[in-house]
UniProtKB/Swiss-Prot annotation:
The modification Phosphoserine is found at residues 2, 5, 13. The gene is PTMS. This is Parathymosin. Parathymosin may mediate immune function by blocking the effect of prothymosin alpha which confers resistance to certain opportunistic infections. The modification N-acetylserine is found at residue 2.
Amino acid sequence: MSEKSVEAAAELSAKDLKEKKEKVEEKASRKERKKEVVEEEENGAEEEEEETAEDGEEEDEGEEEDEEEEEEDDEGPALKRAAEEEDEADPKRQKTENGASA
C-alpha cells in the first residue's frame, strides 16, 4: 500500500509542477505580448512601413520622397523671404494680394 501512495504523491507533484510550469509560461507569454504592444506603439509608423515594404525598391522610393520633402521644407523660408522683399519693393502689389483695394 505504501508504494501506491508514494506513486500517487509523485503523480500529483508531477501534475502540480506541470501546471505551475504552464502558468509561468503563460505569464511570460503575456509579458512578451505586452512588451511587443508597447514597442509597436513606440515605433508606430516606422514598423508599418518596414512590414509593408516587400522589397528594397519600395523602401528606397519612400526615402527619396522624404528627401524631397526635406528639400521643400528648406526652400520654404527662402521663398518667403523673396516674396517679402518683392512686397517691400512694390507696396501696391502687396495690398492687392492681401485683398485690400489699391
